[in-house]
Each structure stands twice: as C-alpha cells, then as structure tokens.
Amino acid sequence: MRRIHLLILFFIALSVHAQFTKFVDPKIGSEGQGRVFIGPSMPYGMVKPGPDCVSMPNAGWEKMPEAVKGFSQTHVSGTGGGQKYGNILIQPFKGTALMTEYPQHRSAETMSLGYYSCDYEEGPHTEITTSERCAIYRFRNLDGLFVDAHTFLGIDTIPDKREAQQFVGSAIKINGEYEITGYSTVRGGWNNGGPYTVYFCLKSDAPFKKSIAKDNKYAWVMFDKSTVNVKVGISFVSTDKARQNIVSSGFDAQLSHLLSTWNALLSKIKINASESQSRMFYTALYHTMLMPVDRSGENPNWTAVPYYDDYYAIWDTYRTSSPLITLLTPQRQRDIVNSLINIYDNEGYMPDARSGNCNGRTQGGSNADIVIADAFAKGLSGIDYEHAFKAMIKDAEVAPADAEKEGRGGIAEYNSLGYIPYGIDRAGNRTVEYSYDDWCIAQVAKGLGHNALYAKYLKRSGNWHNLWRSDYQWQGMRGFIMPRGADGNWLDSVVWGKSKSIILLSPILPTLRLHHGIFLGGEHSSMKPFRQNIV
C-alpha cells in the first residue's frame, strides 16, 4: 500500500509540470557513442546521480542486461574520449555478505526528467532524484547499503595512462547511527587533469543496525527497515560543506521543485509541432542545460564567484548551446562568462575545455574568445569587457607552458608565418580557428575603441588565406584548406581522419570553420553540390 501511495505522489508531481517536461526523454542519445547522462539533474547541476554499469561508459549508464555496479553522484553528459567522475558509489543489497563489489542486474527500469528508478533481480528497488548539490534516494526491499569512496569511472592502475582516471586517496567514516562522511581524490581522466577531491556526507532516515568501515575505502550499513530514504550531499571543498549541501526537502517535494524549475526554462521556447518532433526538440533543449555545471562556492582553489566547471568543450559549445543560453537566460550566460574571466584571473588563461577544476584539453582554438565576443555583440550586461579583453589578448600573444591544457599551441609560428606549418599537431585546424578567434578579438577591440588593435587583429583574421589551396580537388569539388610546411610547400596527400595536421574526416569541415569569411564560390562553384546537401 505504501508503494502505491508513493507512486501516486510521483505521478501527481509529474502531471503538475507536464506541459513541457513531458516531452523530455533522457534516454535519447544515451546509447552507443551518444553517452548522454540519463539520471536526474537540475539545470547546470553539480550533482548528477545515476547508475554506473560494469562496462563504465562515460555517463555511467548502459542498457540492460549490463550489470550495475552502483549509483555514483557525479557524471558528465554526452562526452567523447576518456571518462571523468563517477565518484562516491552507493549500492543497495540483500543478504549479509560484506563484499567490495555488488554488481546486480536490472529486471525493470524507468527514467524521465528528474527521476530514475530500477528494480534489481536480487530484490532491491531504487528511486533517485536530486537537487543542485544533493542526491536523494529512496530504497525499498534492501537489507543493507554499500558505500565505496575509492572507485570511479575509467579507473586504471597503469601510471599516468593517458585519459585514464587514477586513484589518489580516500577516506570514509561512520558517524553514529545515521551518517557517513568521507572523500575521494582522483586525478587524470579525459582532460589529463590534476587531482580533484569529491567530499560527501550521507544521511539516512533509518538507523544503522550494524555498520562497518574498512581501509578508508568502504563502508557497509545494515537496516532493520526495508524502506530507507538516503540523501548524499556533495562538495568539492569539505565534508562540512557537503553536510551543509544536504537539502531539507523530501523526495517528492524535491522532484516537484526540479520539474517546476525545468518547466520554466523549457517553456521559454514554444513550438507548433507533432509529439515526436516536440520530444526531439525539448530533449535537445534539455541537454544544452546540463553542462557546464555551476560550482559557485565549491572551488577549493579560490573563493571568487561565479565559478563554473565542466566546459566540455567550448570548441563544441561556442557555436551551439552557448549563443542559445545568451538569448534564453542572459543572467546565466553572464555568470558563465564571468566564470571564464575568474579562471583567467586565478590561473592565467581562460579554458577551451575544463573539468575537475583543471583546464584542458584544448581542441582547435582559444574559443573562450568567441564566447566573450558573442556576449559583447549581444550587449550582455554585468561583464567587465575591458578586463575580458585582456584575457583575449593573452590568448592571442602569449604561448602557454602546456598548449594541450590552455592557450594557443604554435602561436609563435602562427604570428610569424601567418599560419601554423604541418609538423605541429592540428596545424590546419588551429590556423583556421585562430583566424576566427582573431576576428572576434578585432570586433571587441573595435567596440571598445582600441582602433590600432582592431586593425591588427582584423588583418590577422585573414591568416587562413595562407592555407587556402584553390587548385586542390576532392570528390569533384575544388578549393580547400590544406596543410603547408614552414618552407611554404604544400602537403599534397592527406589521409583524412588519420592526419595530425587536420583532425577531421574531410577537407570540407575545416573549410566550413571559416565563419567570418567562408569561400563557397558562388553559383558556379564546384562546391554547389555540397552546399545543396547541407541546406
């Protein structure tokens, strides 16, 4: 009877906010290489609790019959490359055996915006929702709960293996009959970043009948009750802060608040479309607001706010979700831009990508410059553009110590030759993207009245011409960006998809990155068939 009552409350909460949230299907994009996070999340939420399967895909989830290791509290969404996060794993279990792994198979599973549930074949039933910094669980038909502070996604023991996450240290402590605290410190992952620490505070509404902690890695707690509500506060600063991040609201109240919050955002765009089209549209809109994540007040290295992390990567988002956020929620984009400036103030460069409180990895250009220029062009208020302009100039002029982490690689060659020669990784991509970055710097310089700098960077924005090869033909089309040596000679053969000079599958794609001056040749161009295909 209790379960029926809880289901009724859940569906009431869902129906109240169903006007737009009902169209969001978290499963879209989650299978294969999509790697979209399927669990509950607040907009730009720091905590993203969800299942982690044994195969350890980037966002944790894999379809049945893949076994589930447990539910961790931190995830990214829709990312490629190596894994990141998957910290602080909890797993309900039946029986009394104390093991360090409890992989279990699902017999049923439900997911919707802000809500996830599954039944294990072994018996336990799990429901999950979340606040910005606290995961909320409702367990039924369990005997105990296993807490693992030392595991995570993409774990690897090979020292300094590229893109692998590696264990640094952990601690776990049982505080009385209702609370467990601890932390997990991990380094590496997709951006090859330095160590980051995730602190947690777990609180149960049922007392522990029995509790054991071991090796500063694991804890097991047993219950007399078969229904247990658990909250897991998360912090990147301290266990005390994790405890403060635990919300007072219960499962259903928090779910209702989450749905109301999302509905307000999704309702900013209304479309006249079929149900299937609406489902695709609002799910895509929802996905644009999962990252970056708001960690204001949760930075262990400095206190300036706002602070956002998990820019994954600005190379991808400057032309997609970032301009959209500027239009839909300008106050949010203002905070994101100011966060980029705060990162520059404290670490020396704005990121092109960032995760786990570390910049990296750069993709094609210094693309935070484009985000600043977009905000400036749209008149976004509350930003010190003169100060932001200094960060843009540093990107353009000062070579970083580690060009994979931040800044512009090959900047000396770019500024002296007017292009980056092959032999330097991503030479073609970087030349094209630095040209557009410089065009963006020029626009901000003009708007701020820096006329000499405007002329300088406008001229440099034409550097892509130095890699334009008008006689190169590919699949019946002619005229493309192509790699060139420091001696001025062209690289005649490029194995597309395998070249370090241009990291794309065809010469078309870097050519299309010329947002400020694309050459498509007019009506009589050999590019006409391609133009017709992409329209």
Q: Could you say what each language-model-derived stretch is?
A:
Residues 1-19:
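Bacterial Sec-dependent N-terminal signal peptides
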Residues 19-370, 376-432, 440-466, 472-478, ...:
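Accessory carbohydrate-recognition regions in carbohydrate-active enzymes
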Residues 437:
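ATP-dependent phospho-/nucleotidyl transfer catalytic cores
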